[in-house]
Curated annotation (Swiss-Prot):
BP GO annotations: mitochondrial electron transport, ubiquinol to cytochrome c
Record-linked Gene3D superfamilies: Cytochrome Bc1 Complex, Chain C
Ranges that cross the membrane: 33-53, 77-98, 113-133, 178-198, 226-246, 288-308, 320-340, 347-367
Cofactor: heme b
SS bond list: none
Known partners and oligomeric status: The cytochrome bc1 complex contains 11 subunits: 3 respiratory subunits (MT-CYB, CYC1 and UQCRFS1), 2 core proteins (UQCRC1 and UQCRC2) and 6 low-molecular weight proteins (UQCRH/QCR6, UQCRB/QCR7, UQCRQ/QCR8, UQCR10/QCR9, UQCR11/QCR10 and a cleavage product of UQCRFS1). This cytochrome bc1 complex then forms a dimer.
Membrane topology designation: Multi-pass membrane protein
Biological source species: Planigale gilesi (Flat-skulled marsupial mouse)
Protein name in UniProt: Cytochrome b
Subcellular location, record wording: Mitochondrion inner membrane
Assigned GO CC terms: mitochondrial inner membrane; respiratory chain complex III
Length: 381
């Protein structure tokens, strides 16, 4: 009798994706984050669904409905804390996942990489509209500041901003539509994840050496299912530690106050995972220039495959490129720190220098490091 998982039309898809999938034998723990992102997505959809059952998307009751969830709903505090901190874990895994792709040259699978960038943008959009829903001070003013950036677009900007708001300012209509967007986007993300995996399984996974691994493959199960389970254990442990012991440590204290359009907080800032882009936005004194820099900081990922100049795929054997990569990582951490500071010296100049270095590293220094490696390989030692 033939095995059901190899004959049943539905089981066959699961089998080819997670059980009998030929995987490179040498992929490291950095390859765990793809599956962890899948788990994060499931956690966010489930906790979000239960929150949506009790949340009301009205300016008068949104804030109190979130308080009601935490006080009166059975384990509502836990669901809310898991959802809020789950977003932080999601972005942590996401940035590591992108960083791994950048380091090991996975971006040369262009379709997979491009869908990944679209996924990143969609997740960022989802997180932004989700942050507005509790209708606290930072929710309201964050929504006002970021959506107001649309008005920087010449000619159609103001009309576009008012179209998004559903009025002349962020109000009831904005909150209602943001809730609708926040509900539908995770399902769009799920569809994009399937497309992402479809393209990945066309070429197969990359590996740390960057060499074609076709001659040495092992089945995904049990080797990588066990490895992923270990990663999952660490993820859940970290998430539960965050959600149970310090659930508000990554949030903003201003969000404990209900939204008040007449009182502007002294320092408007988004969640920590957007601070690097926010710092780049603020580093340019011109509104339109800042918006373009903000977009470029993310969309630059789309041109990375065309900036690859080295003969070797991975950075594993390219020490100069490795050094630049870790400088870029440190630079992004610096930008994240600057994004959370007040707009005053010395933070302004640090932010401007870090923003210049960010684009300089990706557009100029890293391609030059690849060419330098090619030149060194050609020398007869």
């Amino acid at each position: 009798m033939t095995n059901l998982r190899k004959t049943h039309p539905l089981m066959k898809i699961i089998n080819h994706s997670f059980i009998d999938l030929p995987a490179p034998s040498n992929i490291s723990a950095w390859w765990n984050f793809g599956s962890l992102l899948g788990i994060c997505l499931v956690i966010q959809i489930l906790t979000g669904l239960f929150l949506a059952m009790h949340y009301t998307s009205d300016t008068l009751t949104a804030f109190s409905s979130v308080a009601h969830i935490c006080r009166d709903v059975n384990y509502g505090w836990l669901i809310r804390n898991l959802h809020a901190n789950g977003a932080s874990m999601f972005f942590m895994c996401l940035y590591i996942h992108v960083g791994r792709g950048f380091y090991y040259g996975s971006y040369l699978n262009k379709e997979t990489w491009n869908i990944g960038v679209i996924l990143l943008l969609t997740v960022m959009a989802t997180a932004f509209v989700g942050y507005v829903l509790p209708w606290g001070q930072m929710s309201f003013w964050g929504a006002t500041v970021i959506t107001n950036l649309l008005s920087a677009i010449p000619y159609i900007g103001t009309t576009l901003a008012e179209w998004i708001w559903g009025g002349f300012a962020v109000d009831k209509a904005t909150l209602t539509r943001f809730f609708a967007f926040h509900f539908i986007l995770p399902f769009i993300i799920t569809a994009l994840v399937i497309v992402h995996l479809l393209f990945l399984h066309e070429t197969g996974s990359n590996n740390p050496s960057g060499i074609n691994p076709d001659s040495d493959k092992i089945p995904f199960h049990p080797y990588y299912t066990i490895k992923d389970a270990l990663g999952l254990m660490f993820l859940l442990l970290t998430l539960l530690m965050l959600a149970l012991f310090s659930p508000d440590s990554l949030g903003d204290p201003d969000n404990f106050s209900p939204a008040n359009p007449l009182n502007t907080p002294p320092h408007i800032k988004p969640e920590w995972y957007f601070l690097f882009a926010y710092a780049i936005l603020r580093s340019i004194p011109n509104k339109l220039g800042g918006v373009l820099a903000l977009l470029a900081s993310i969309l630059i990922l789309l041109i990375i495959p065309f900036l690859h100049t080295a003969n070797q795929r991975s950075m594993m054997f390219r020490p100069v490129s490795q050094t630049l990569f870790w400088i870029l990582t440190a630079n992004l951490i610096t930008l994240t720190w600057i994004g959370g500071q007040l707009v005053e010296q010395p933070f302004i100049i640090i932010g401007q220098l870090a923003s210049i270095l960010y684009f300089l590293l990706i557009l100029v220094l890293m391609p030059l490091a690849g060419l330098f490696k090619n030149y060194m390989l050609k020398l007869k030692w």
